[in-house]
Amino acid sequence: MNFAFGAAFISAKVGVGEFPPFLFTAMRFLIIALLLIPFLKIHHGQMINILIISFLGGGIHFSFFYLALDNSKYISSVAIVLQLGVPFATILSVIFLNEVIRWRRVLGILFAFSGVIILIFEPTVFNDLGGVYYALLAAFSMSVSLLFMKKLNDVKVFDLQAW
């Protein structure tokens, strides 16, 4: 699984080197849409949440992700910053879903943000701040989409991916 995710970053970096980021995003979604058409189903009463999820977690997230790669010299800085999606989602779930987290999780969130702050001040990454900002936006948009995913009932993975 780790290999697949790592390979996805490398292939995406190569892709945005050949195509503009928004065109690459559109091409990616066209290919996936063709593969997932059989799973495209209407889920009555849940379509607004599904469309918000597909917009934020799909189009917006991947547009910012590809912009981050296009504006970064190093893939590693983008990959690390994208890991803030989990702390963002946790913070948002506390604010909007009234979830409760304990001190260990708070400490983990602080470590995650501290690590990214340290990364940003590394000289090679400091020159790639445009990519870091786009990666932050990509992570945040995915985190917001996760809040909407929590509201879904009986929607299968491929059904959601198809949208």
Label each region the model flagged:
Residues 47-56, 101-113, 131-135, 155-163:
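Cytoplasmic-side transmembrane-helix entry/capping segments in multi-pass membrane proteins
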Residues 32-36, 89-91, 127-163:
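Transmembrane alpha-helical segments that form core, pore/gating elements
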Residues 30, 36, 53, 91-92, ...:
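Hydrophobic transmembrane alpha-helices of multi-pass small-molecule transport proteins
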Residues 3-31, 144-163:
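Juxtamembrane helix-loop-helix junctions in multi-pass membrane proteins
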Residues 23-33, 69-100, 138:
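Specific alpha-helical transmembrane segments that line the substrate/conduction pathway
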Residues 3-9, 37-82, 87-90, 118:
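Specific transmembrane alpha-helical segments of multi-pass solute transporters/efflux pumps
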Residues 18-21, 26, 43-48, 121-141:
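Juxtamembrane helix-entry segments on the extracytoplasmic side of multipass membrane proteins
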Residues 16, 67-73, 121-130, 151:
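Membrane-interface helix caps and helix-loop-helix hairpins in membrane proteins
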